[in-house]
UniProtKB/Swiss-Prot annotation:
NAD(+) binds at D54, G116, T117, I118, H119, D120, T138, A139, P140, S141, S147. Optimum pH is 8.2. Its cofactor is Ni(2+). GO terms for molecular function: 3-dehydroquinate synthase activity; glycerol-1-phosphate dehydrogenase (NAD+) activity; glycerol-1-phosphate dehydrogenase (NADP+) activity; metal ion binding. Induction: Transcription is repressed by glucose and by the binding of AraR to the operon promoter. L-arabinose acts as an inducer by inhibiting the binding of AraR to the DNA, thus allowing expression of the gene. GO terms for biological process: glycerophospholipid metabolic process; phospholipid biosynthetic process. The lineage of its organism: Bacteria, Bacillati, Bacillota, Bacilli, Bacillales. It comes from Bacillus subtilis (strain 168). This is Glycerol-1-phosphate dehydrogenase [NAD(P)+]. Ni(2+) binds at D190, H270, H290.
Amino acid sequence: MNRIAADVQRAFENAGEKTLPIKVEEIVLGKQAADSLLDYVKRKNNQHIVLVCDANTHRIAGIDLENRLNQEGFQAECLIIPENEAGDVTADERSLIHVLIHTKQPTDVMIAVGSGTIHDIVRFAAFQRDLPFISYPTAPSVDGFTSAGAPIILYGTKTTIQTKAPSALFADLDLLKAAPQSMVAAGFGDMLGKITSLADWEISRHLAGEPYSPAGAKIVQEALAACIEHTEDIAMKTETGIRVLMESLLVSGLVMLALDHSRPASGGEHHISHWIEMELMEKKRPQILHGAKVGCAAVLLTDTYRKLAQDDGLNEFSPSRREAIQSAYQTLPRGEVLADWLRSAGGPAYFDEIGVGQDSVKNAFRHAHTLRDRCTGLRIINENKTLINHGLYE
């Protein structure tokens, strides 16, 4: 097992917590990662290889990787997913069917060449075809590379399906450093979203009896802290900054994989992001980077949750429930602190900066909690009229 995965597994074991085994055989984060990928497929004797890309990732990484594989005697072919009417590649029925239909027989392994959306499509397709897949990220933009969950759009609704994790991941630092600043900032935003997701997870433990892992929370908290500590390096896209960001994203994904759920990394801020994504698709508007939406939602929710912890409407709750809510939310950083971090990394901090209007944000705030059967501060506010009447929508 590789170091990053071994460290995560060991942290759970040292805490005496039982988890699913982490079966990502190899994780390489460094220079010339493609060399390690070639060595890996040779050892696995994977002869027929399908690389799944979009037009952009095909240009920046897919062509070169396909050529290198074919020069080594493999039968490799790039499968480029076409854009939709809004000019996006999305993980929806259209893209999933395209990949399933055009993945030829025989295929020994699939390679996801891209960022979050490409990986969601490939992990679902590989799961359906009972094939292993390899992760080859092109930007440090999301934490889902090493997870098994595939958030996809089915019949217009964002749904997360547990599928499979990659058998191996090869992340080239030079390729990641060359990613657009917006995608680096999105990865940072996805990590800052852990501020609210971890608080929501704590609440779900006490108020709904949902599964909780102290070790998992600690691992994700430490990964988040590392990113905040290296905000300037991440903003400057130094080798250290990109390594810290990418490793933190990978660790978050591995924790989700070990626990077989996304609670430590996905709370109310992700539900708001998903709702807005669905609205953009319905209106056939271009998509916004996942991490950018998550970061903006975290800014909104930290301030809202701090208000919730102080709201006298909580007097309607039992003492134990009230204390749990106050304990989880009253020490969250102010939204303006998160906004400063996000802007330092070159990303947006508020929804109006990414073209999402106030009506859309209010709509997401009122309805996004219905996307997942999960206890979050967002759900508590929306399902308790006492709190609503005290102005927490404003």
